[in-house]
From Swiss-Prot:
Positions on the Lumenal side per record topology: 58-68
Cytoplasmic topology ranges: 1-36, 90-105
Lineage: Eukaryota, Metazoa, Ecdysozoa, Arthropoda, Hexapoda
Protein name: Vacuolar ATPase assembly integral membrane protein VMA21 homolog
Keyword Membrane carried by entry: yes
GO process terms (BP): vacuolar proton-transporting V-type ATPase complex assembly
Coiled-coil region(s): none
Cited function: Required for the assembly of the V0 complex of the vacuolar ATPase (V-ATPase) in the endoplasmic reticulum.
Organism of derivation: Drosophila yakuba (Fruit fly)
Membrane protein topology class: Multi-pass membrane protein
Ranges for region Disordered: 1-26
Keywords for this protein: Cytoplasmic vesicle, Endoplasmic reticulum, Membrane, Transmembrane, Transmembrane helix
Domain of life: Eukaryota
Stretches that traverse the bilayer: 37-57, 69-89
Similarity section: Belongs to the VMA21 family.
Length: 105
């Protein structure tokens, strides 16, 4: 029997390797989505918090000076940044539910 016939008779000898590769690709894509989400949260949440506090909350409803509005908005943005970083660190440390690290050889 030639090697060509052996491969044809062997069925799907490459299927487990293909499935394993798809599994790794799926895990990589899931990790990429998670990191991208937290990066966007860390970048955009403080900026949005600053402008929402400044433009809609503090200027509209409170009668305080412009400097105090800017300071309060900046403090709110720093708090929002720390919350986003805390969420990322919590997720990185404790991991997602059901995502146990498993070693496959």
């Amino acid at each position: 029997m030639s090697t060509k016939n052996k491969k044809a008779a062997g069925g799907n000898g490459g299927a487990p390797k293909q499935t394993r590769q798809q599994s790794h690709d799926s895990q990589d894509y899931s990790s990429f989505k998670t990191v991208l989400f937290y990066c966007m949260l860390i970048v955009f949440l403080p900026v949005l918090t600053f402008f929402v506090l400044k433009g809609f909350v503090l200027d509209q409803f409170l009668d305080i000076s412009e400097v105090k509005v800017n300071i309060a908005s900046a403090v709110g943005a720093v708090v929002a940044l720390h919350v986003a970083l805390g969420l990322y660190i919590y997720r990185a440390y404790f991991g997602a539910p059901g995502s146990k690290a498993s070693k496959t050889d």
